[in-house]
Amino acid sequence: MLKDLILKNRSYRRFDESRSIEREVLRELVDLARLSASGANMQSVRFYLSNGQEENNAINECLKWAGYLKGWSPAEGERATAFIVMLKDKERKSSTAYDEGIAAQSILLGAAEKGLGGCMLGAVDREKLHAVLGLDEKYEILLVVALGYPCETVVIEEAKDNDIKYWRSEDGVHHVPKRSLDELIVN
């Protein structure tokens, strides 16, 4: 059922770095994005795939992880083993404001189905990453999707006192407070 897949698809930030992800798996995930809905069917999002350790390390240096956990980033051995960098081609008419979210969700649901975990990252040093990847100037970086085999537990819980900041307990469990359904529905 889709709800089970959505519950499995959490924002994972720690991975088993000893387990690699083949490029073909990344291509399969991007294919899910390709087959997904797209505003005016423009299919304007482009993708840069990385699954090599050296390039992944360079990408990692351009990312800021977990905004509510100040100064935190994955430790060596717990970093993502693959990245999909989502791009906008500035020379094409675009509907990326919607399409990037649709594509990222499709990629992450596909990853969850394969036993992978991922995290969408918008806190990116785009200028530095653009240079690291040697991208053509026509590409603008939208999002980075980090992927790997999760090595952490993420739990959903009801938000208390309107506090939605995620946090980690002493045992390393990542807690994600969610607003109630009644709070989200306005009528």
Positions of PLM-derived features:
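Acidic, surface-exposed loops and disordered segments
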Residues: 1-187
